[in-house]
């Protein structure tokens, strides 16, 4: 997380291992923005933190042109900050799987072209990757998985169209 509190330490450690594949984990929810709050007021609160509600943020990202412009600016700023580390960009994903959001995913591909993006980590998980001991939890996980698979299907198609590689599965 390029905006995380341990980013300098992580960069220092990554440079020790030049063959280590390092990705950009975009922060667009539940974390700090890289840009000043005055530049992206639609995205963050007064102390520079993204909103915690992924649902609310997702609605704004999709329907508000003003918010999308600011989102594009923030995503580009995070790509640029990663670029300045001197590390080779291996892949991109987003905190809390926010790159599943079609607006964010499209912006990642668009902006990523300027930063030699070749791979995106897609949250393609097995249907029930852990034991569930109650029916309600089972149903929640099952419907979440269906939702994810719908989005990941379209993500994979778009990646193929743009010559971007992606993982087969994650756990």
Language model features with spans:
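Active-site beta-loop-alpha junctions enriched in small/polar residues
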Residues: 1-4, 25-31, 95-97, 125-127, ...
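Acidic (Asp/Glu)-rich catalytic clusters
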Residues: 7-21, 42-48, 83-84, 113, ...
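Non-cysteine beta-strand/loop elements that form the S-adenosyl-L-methionine
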Residues: 21-28, 46-54, 122-123
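Glycine/small-residue-rich hydrophobic helix-like segments
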Residues: 158-171
């Amino acid at each position: 997380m390029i905006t995380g509190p341990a980013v300098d330490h992580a960069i220092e450690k990554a440079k020790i291992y030049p063959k280590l594949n390092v990705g950009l984990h975009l922060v667009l929810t539940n974390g700090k923005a890289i840009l000043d709050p005055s530049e992206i007021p639609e995205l963050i609160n007064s102390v520079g933190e993204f909103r915690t509600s992924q649902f609310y943020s997702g609605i704004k990202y999709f329907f508000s042109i003003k918010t999308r412009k600011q989102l594009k600016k923030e995503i580009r700023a995070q790509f640029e900050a990663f670029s300045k580390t001197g590390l080779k960009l291996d892949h991109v994903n987003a905190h809390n799987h926010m790159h599943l959001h079609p607006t964010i995913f499209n912006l990642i591909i668009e902006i990523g072209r300027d930063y030699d993006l070749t791979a995106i980590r897609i949250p393609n998980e097995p249907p029930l990757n852990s034991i569930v001991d109650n029916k309600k939890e089972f149903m929640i996980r099952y419907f979440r998985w269906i939702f994810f698979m719908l989005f990941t299907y379209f993500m994979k198609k778009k990646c193929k169209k743009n010559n971007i590689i992606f993982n087969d599965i994650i756990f």
